[in-house]
Swiss-Prot record:
InterPro entries (alphabetical): ArchSynthase1/Queuine_TRR, TGT, TGT-like_sf, tRNA_ribo_trans-like
GO molecular function terms noted in the UniProt entry: metal ion binding; tRNA-guanosine(34) queuine transglycosylase activity
GO cellular component: cytosol
Assembly description: Homodimer. Within each dimer, one monomer is responsible for RNA recognition and catalysis, while the other monomer binds to the replacement base PreQ1.
Provenance organism: Cupriavidus pinatubonensis (strain JMP 134 / LMG 1197)
This protein's pathway: tRNA modification; tRNA-queuosine biosynthesis
Residues that hold Zn(2+) according to the record: C308, C310, C313, H339
Residues that coordinate or bind substrate: D90, S91, G92, G93, F94, D144, Q193, G220
Entry keyword Transferase: yes
Active-site positions on this chain: D90 (proton acceptor), D270 (nucleophile)
EC number of the protein: 2.4.2.29
Lineage of producing organism: Bacteria, Pseudomonadati, Pseudomonadota, Betaproteobacteria, Burkholderiales
Annotated cofactor note: Binds 1 zinc ion per subunit.
Listed GO biological process terms: queuosine biosynthetic process; tRNA wobble guanine modification; tRNA-guanine transglycosylation
Protein name, UniProt field: Queuine tRNA-ribosyltransferase
Length: 376
């Protein structure tokens, strides 16, 4: 089940509300990534406290470990991981295609060697839908071929991108058919592919639109292409997506990318950046980024961001976070992650408010000015 309400718009920016089987999601929204059923360094309680409304799980990795039998014992992923709000799962396609020479693609699906134990495995649109039905994720993603930016060290040609995109379209139909055969009560999103070519993106969207998905994602971006190419494709595709369905930009990105995505008409985002960077001591603030490992923070009594209300900023100094990072304490990764995810979620709250008040353009200018100012 999915119900999408478009509350208001401001230019191409959209303020919406998505109702799913496990709850309501206010959009634009950022979705923390929980690859193995866990958002790294965060408990479900902490995710609730910072205002997370929906998280991601990874179909490919959860299929391999712990395995569907374990998840099925818990009647789905929600009970297994102790999270009662919505979950989106990807199809496993991106991970399979990231295996490179370890996999073989045919019309039927993909054969590959398990990265866990080397076993020969097979994943297809039908199997992906079956796995995601067992996971009982609120939003299921179609099985697709993520068109790489580079093939053999050079940008993918129009012909290569077209072949990949049309395979994904055929797999989209099979995903939709299997989703319906399983009588899955959740929502299914199609994924627009086509590489860096606008005409192929248009062809992909036209084909997906005939299948009447519950929502539409933009895939195949942030896969190594120059930022200007990413923005060109994003700004072409996002405004053309069906206005009455949620729009999801997969795997993107920086705070600046999120705001640019909203301006283009995107409603949903995910990225490992805030959690991965947190563990590496790279922290996002209203006034630019802080590399907490740098010696400049060794004796700094200030919080990371004096405008931030997260647990980390309310209770700890830059000096303490610097110390934790330098000595490798687990608490450092946890406090850093709490802050970075809070920052991303608070950014989306401010974006939503600015769209509601029809001042998103002003917000965007102030956001860019603040981030460019840098921390002091």
């Amino acid at each position: 089940m999915l119900n999408f309400e478009l509350i208001t718009t401001d230019g191409n920016a959209r303020r919406g509300r998505v109702t799913l089987n496990h709850g309501v999601v206010e959009t634009p929204i950022f979705m923390p990534v929980g690859t193995y059923g866990s958002v790294k360094a965060m408990s479900p309680l902490e995710l609730n406290e910072i205002g997370a409304e929906i998280i991601l799980g990874n179909t490919f990795h959860l299929w391999l470990r712990p395995g569907l039998d374990v998840v099925n014992t818990h009647e789905g992923l929600h009970r297994f991981i102790g999270w009662d709000k919505p979950i989106l799962t990807d199809s496993g396609g991106f991970q399979v295609f990231s295996l490179g020479d370890l996999r073989k693609i045919t019309e039927d699906g993909v054969t590959f060697a398990s990265p866990v134990n080397g076993d020969k495995l097979f994943l297809s649109p039908e199997i992906s839908m079956q796995i995601q039905r067992t996971l009982n994720s609120d939003i299921v993603m179609q099985f697709d071929e993520c068109t790489p930016y580079e093939i053999e060290g050079r940008p993918a040609t129009h012909e290569e991108a077209a072949k990949s995109m049309r395979m994904s379209l055929r797999w989209a139909k099979r995903s939709r058919d299997e989703f319906e055969r399983l009588a899955n009560p959740n929502a299914l999103f199609g994924i627009v592919q086509g590489g860096m070519f606008e005409d192929l993106r248009d062809e992909s969207l036209a084909g997906l639109s005939e299948l009447d998905f519950h929502g539409f994602a933009i895939g195949g971006l942030s896969v190594g292409e120059p930022k200007e190419d990413m923005m060109r494709v994003l700004e072409h595709v996002a405004p053309r997506l069906p206005a009455d369905k949620p729009h999801y930009l997969m795997g993107v990105g920086t705070p600046e990318d999120l705001v640019a995505g909203v301006a283009a008409g995107v409603d949903m985002f995910d990225c490992v950046m805030p959690t991965r960077n947190a563990r590496n001591g790279w922290l996002f603030t209203r006034y630019g980024d802080v590399k907490i490992r740098n010696a400049a923070h060794r004796n700094d009594p200030r919080p990371l961001d004096e405008s931030c209300a997260c647990y980390t900023c309310r209770n700890f100094s830059r000096a303490y976070l610097h110390h934790l990072h330098r000595v490798g304490e687990i608490l450092g990764a946890r406090l850093n992650t709490i802050h970075n995810l809070h920052y991303y979620l608070q950014l989306m709250r401010e974006v939503r408010e600015s769209i509601e008040q029809h001042r998103f353009s002003d917000f965007r200018r102030q956001f860019a000015s603040d981030r460019a100012r840098g921390t002091r």
